[in-house]
Amino acid sequence: MAGTKPGDLGGIKVGQYIVIDGIACKVMDYAHSKPGKHGGAKVRLVAVGIFEPVKKEHVGPASSRIDIPIIDKRKGQVLALMGDNVQLMDMESYETLEIPMPDDVEGIESGVEVEYFEAMDRYKITRVISK
């Protein structure tokens, strides 16, 4: 899977990012339990998708591996608003991107500087930096 690295399921904490069923998610709840004398510890995670508003759950042994998405946080400038999309220029590479307009970020207009991130070849605007 491109854009991911392996990690220990037992080492995951609330607020970290993981991949469940090919979807990059943020961990919202973590439960660690040891079932008994002869059983291995189990981990139960509840996570919410970064790009889709889906709730995912994963249960597995604490010693197992799970994919962790490589998230690249960057700054960009909004060039134009085009319906449901935002045309954005990366402030480091000057590359032009077309990203879906987020529902939860306010103040996006032409000329403002925003923070966005890339994970698994998808992009999302996270906040407005300056107006």
Swiss-Prot record:
Entry-linked Pfam families? eIF-5a (PF01287), IF5A-like_N (PF21485)
Q: Which UniProt keywords apply?
A: Cytoplasm, Hypusine, Initiation factor, Protein biosynthesis
Q: Molecular function (GO) terms listed?
A: ribosome binding; RNA binding; translation elongation factor activity; translation initiation factor activity
Its annotated compartments are: Cytoplasm
Residues bearing Hypusine?
K37
- PROSITE patterns this protein is in? IF5A_HYPUSINE (PS00302)
Q: InterPro entries of this UniProt entry?
A: IF5A-like, IF5A-like_N, NA-bd_OB-fold, Rib_uL2_dom2, Trans_elong_IF5A_hypusine_site, Transl_elong_IF5A_arc, Transl_elong_IF5A_C, Translation_prot_SH3-like_sf
Q: Name one GO cellular component term.
A: cytoplasm
> Which GO BP terms, alphabetically?
positive regulation of translational elongation; positive regulation of translational termination
The record's annotation in NCBIfam families points to: eIF_5A, PRK03999.1
Q: Which family does the record claim for this protein?
A: Belongs to the eIF-5A family.
The role this protein plays is:
Functions by promoting the formation of the first peptide bond.
- Tell me the protein's name: Translation initiation factor 5A
Q: Which gene encodes it?
A: eIF5A
